[in-house]
Amino acid sequence: MMKAKTLDGGELDLTPDLLSGLKMQLQGPLLTPDDPDYEASRRLWNAMIDRRPAMVVRCLGVADVMASVRFAREHDLLLCIKGGGHNIAGLAVADGALMLDLSLMRGVWVDRDRRVAHAQAGCVLGDVDRETQVHGLATVLGFISTTGIAGLTLGGGFGYLSRRWGYTSDNVLGMEVVTPDGELVHATADENADLFWGLRGGGGNFGVVTGFDYRLYPVGPEVVGGVVAWPASEAPAVLELYRSLAEQAPPELTLVALLRPAPPAPGCRRDTMASRLWHYSPVIAAIRKRARRRSRRSRLLASPSATC
């Protein structure tokens, strides 16, 4: 008989009646290790994490989350939550736990007039960007489009727009939260303000966040960005240049220095280091023009090995 871990370190027998009772409360599927979709649902971005929850609820909506949390509370079960599953430490999955997989909850609604987006907690960054960019709007998210919004936001979050508008958590206006007793509440600066304060950067241990309201800004839909690469032998001078430019750059310009092989591109060798530039106003030409008038160190920006 299958068993699930309890919070006191014990085990609970998952009898057919117990599983059937939970299934009757759900709209989404309840997966156990015998189900064909179980393996894919427990997998995370970090493939080194290989943990096996006792069962997985693939939530289709808030009601599924509420029912699952109440079930876990009633039986004192270990509970874990998967949003985008991108956390490097694999916090979304635990051995023997009841795992809530929110990856089917990926709706995004944009209020263009109020410049607010509501996104379900299973969204990845690309889901939000695709919908907001229809209106020439964006919020502060991260760097990788396959990252989940939930972990990013609850951990603070920073990305290409952070120099201009702060952390992701600075731009959250409200959150839908299923509390540990299975109730749904709304947390804002005015409603459940202490919960709102804790969630904005404090992680997800105060409840299961099922949706976020984000402040939007006029950005795009056309932006300028790319990768500039230099030989690895120039790394000290390039990093000095990066530090200098980062101090002087306008808030619309984001620079990220990466000591890594450059991506495949004409003129890029394996011994080439890459630096990523991203901006949403036409500043790169002016910076490169200024760089040509400065020292050898600054001329590195004007004459990289390759750009892509």
Identify the function of each model-found stretch.
Residues 37, 83-89, 142-150:
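Short, solvent-exposed turn/loop segments enriched in Gly/Ser/Thr/Pro and often Arg
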Residues 138, 175, 180-308:
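C-terminal cap/substrate-recognition region of VAO/PCMH-type FAD-linked oxidoreductases
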